[in-house]
Amino acid sequence: EYGVSIAVENHSDATSRDLLMMCETLDSAHIGITLDTGNVLSVLEEPIGYATRLMPYLKNVHLKDYTIHPTDEGYRIVRCSLGEGVVDFPDLLALIDKHHPDITKTIELGAVNARHVRMLMDDYWAEFPDRIFTDMLPHQRLFWDNVRPRDEDWRSPHERDEADEVLAAYETREFEESVAYLKGIGVV
């Protein structure tokens, strides 16, 4: 009636198949997806495959990047400037622009604290009982090609309780680096 759309964001608890099922079930031009390019790593998928599966329903994109740090229980994803992490933005954005040339894209630097993806623990899988293993293969390739050294300090200035001026400089630097990266690949 009002021409308003709802674009559900893929947070750390929804696979691409979950969101595809939601969109297909609701079957409305006013229901779609906000693709967060970093959040897909929390559900053991990789951004290009995730976007491809949901392409007909994309309405908005949050540009976010993460580095991957192994743990005994799985891995941590740690925010970083765009282009410094594992997301292949040139290929991903070319794919999205091919199908949605006017889609809104915003920089979202991400969580101030690392997210711990405990994929090696049984309780992680309780949330995803019907996962299809082949959906996770591209993620595993991405993981193993980009995993950081186990002894690398992954903590952000927020997690180290740095002073406010250090936090402000960190936030500004990551934003400016992200904008420069997007300019460098011709997005801005």
What is the predicted role of each segment?
Residues L35-N39:
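Short, acidic/turn-prone active-site loops that include or flank metal/cofactor-
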Residues A7-E9, T34, T106-E108:
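Generic enzyme active-site microenvironment
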